[in-house]
Amino acid sequence: MDATDDIRAGELASDWSGSPDAGVVFIGRIHTPWNRLKECPRHGRADGPVCRIEVFETWLPALAGIDDGTLLEVFYWLHRSRRDLLLQCPRNDGDARGTFSIRSPLRPNPIGTSIARVDRRDGANLFIRGLDCLDGTPLVDLKPDRAEFMPLAPPKPGDFQVGEPRR
């Protein structure tokens, strides 16, 4: 769906027209083989085509420590997605579900995320597989995958806390 598409039977759009609460700085651009939403996969595959993440020059020093083989969580802005749908029918069968209960790219803050391993790094370019976004998608952030990352900073008391949260 593009932002200009009609909604499907059973779907509901918001009429919210307030101002945003926060700003986002794009740190790069993602280059993929997909130019149209109908071509783009619903989920990235580890054996999918190689895509290129271009990190803008300002942010190049922030890539220090990212090497070939690094497993990253890639955050991107799904800039061609609708942002007003509250109820969606992912199967196009009229059976609506709340936007927050599905992984649709159509959401108030269209942030996409994929876990991908760096095949190769060449300066400001990361070549990876496993993305599910359009060519030219803005890059929001890169983080090491939680499963492989051990914090470098000293532990804090909350790191060891277990049990029920206070109410």
From Swiss-Prot:
Q: Which domain of life is it from?
A: Bacteria
Keyword annotations: S-adenosyl-L-methionine
Report the InterPro entries cross-referenced here: TrmO-like_N, YaeB-like, YaeB-like_sf, YaeB_N_sf
Q: Where is this region: Disordered?
A: 148-167
Please verify whether the record's keywords include 4Fe-4S: no
Q: Which residues bind S-adenosyl-L-methionine?
A: P41, R42, H43, H79, R80, R103, T113, D132, C133, L134, D135, G136, T137
Coiled-coil ranges per the record?
A: none
Where is each TsaA-like domain found?
24-154
Q: Which cysteines are joined by disulfide bonds?
A: none
What protein family is recorded? Belongs to the tRNA methyltransferase O family.
Q: How does it assemble?
A: Homodimer.
- Protein name from the UniProt record: S-adenosyl-L-methionine-binding protein RPA0152
